[in-house]
Amino acid sequence: MSEEAPKWFNYKPSRIDKMSIPDVPGLKVFIKRDDLIHPIVSGNKWRKLKYNLSSLHIEGLISFGGAFSNHLHALAYACHMRSLPLKAIVRGEPQYLDNPTLQDIHCWGAEIIFVDRNSYRKRYDRDYLASLKKKYPTYKIIPEGGSN
């Protein structure tokens, strides 16, 4: 599949750097610099999210993460760029809004829904996911970390 990005995403293909290891002559080592894809949605985050974000028939997204989740941070930025609503279900308490990750997520327009640890454990529970789908029928649910 192509790694072509949507027009709203300022995507730069990751370069491949050759690395020399003087102690091991003849060894060829190459590093794919996915960290350079984008300053916020980089590396494996882009690879995991690009297919979810290209779905045409969704009106919003729901996903899960902790108070310092790189996944939610990247997803919130991408949703903001696409003008797509995001409901971020976050394990923790509202006082965590003091951290830069959640401040960015909030500034990019995501609705942050704080849940306790017991509620957060339900994020893979079939009945819980069905209740979210019933409540938000036009939203796509993305697992924690974008692992779908």
Residue ranges and their predicted role:
Residues 1-148:
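PLP-dependent amino-acid enzyme catalytic core
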